[in-house]
């Protein structure tokens, strides 16, 4: 139950009169950023900023369920955004895999 600060881009000063659950992408019942959180009305196409992503960020992240780590962006005080870590690729995920030669023989 860690608290994650969440804002809706462009609606920072809007009245928080809607209740949402904000969840992660894993198939786990505890992959939640917020439950019953009051936020401004969120429309399709709105961007949500989760200011502190915990285990979804690189520092605590891992490839659970084969999930690739997301890109990380830095939101500067002047409102500009900068990519500080690119998203992982499948090549990254399998880069350390080293299967011994005879292990992958087809069954007769």
Task: Report the location of each language-model feature.
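Charged (often Lys/Glu-rich) extended helix/loop segments that serve as interaction or gating elements
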Residues: 1-108
